[in-house]
Amino acid sequence: MQTTEKLHPEAIGLDKKSDLEILTILYEGQIEAAKCVSESMASLEAGAKAMADAVLMGNKLVYAAAGSSGLQGMADGLELTPTFGIPISQIKILRAGGLQDMSQPKGNMDDNKLAAKSDAEIIEPGDCVICLAA
């Protein structure tokens, strides 16, 4: 079983904890996750530069993800035009299972290699691919 699909140790007995205990567990988990960012600042800077360079050269920003990460990528990508004026033609979103009818969950799409290969055909030299994962 993948790590992201396993039950977190703090979730055991969660239904027996108070609301405050549950909120504290969730809050502390977010704080721990945020601490990881400081270790990745140089990589984040390089990624931001790659994105800016792609946009300035007229190339695409391509978000690639599955599941809820795909939804986050879509939300981020769609915000770039109104917020930063990046033409929508330079923003592409690849989500396992597609973007149509996202109100229905699609199982087993994350590992569809043929669909991934087909989706990836839009990527061209100079594009910046942003891969998101839970």
At which residue positions do the language-model features occur?
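Cofactor-/ligand-binding subdomain signature composed of acidic, glycine-rich
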Residues: 1-36
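Short secondary-structure boundary/capping elements
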Residues: 14-18, 43, 108-115
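Well-ordered alpha-helical segments embedded in enzymatic catalytic cores
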Residues: 21, 46-50, 115-118
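Flexible, glycine/charged-enriched surface loops at secondary-structure junctions
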Residues: 36, 44-45, 61, 65
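Glycine-rich oxoanion-binding loops at beta->alpha junctions
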Residues: 37, 81-133
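A short, well-structured juxtamembrane/interface segment
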Residues: 39-56
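A short, small-residue-rich loop immediately preceding and capping a beta-strand
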Residues: 59-68, 125-134
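Glycine-rich loop at the start of a catalytic domain that most often binds anionic cofactors/ligands
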Residues: 68, 74-81
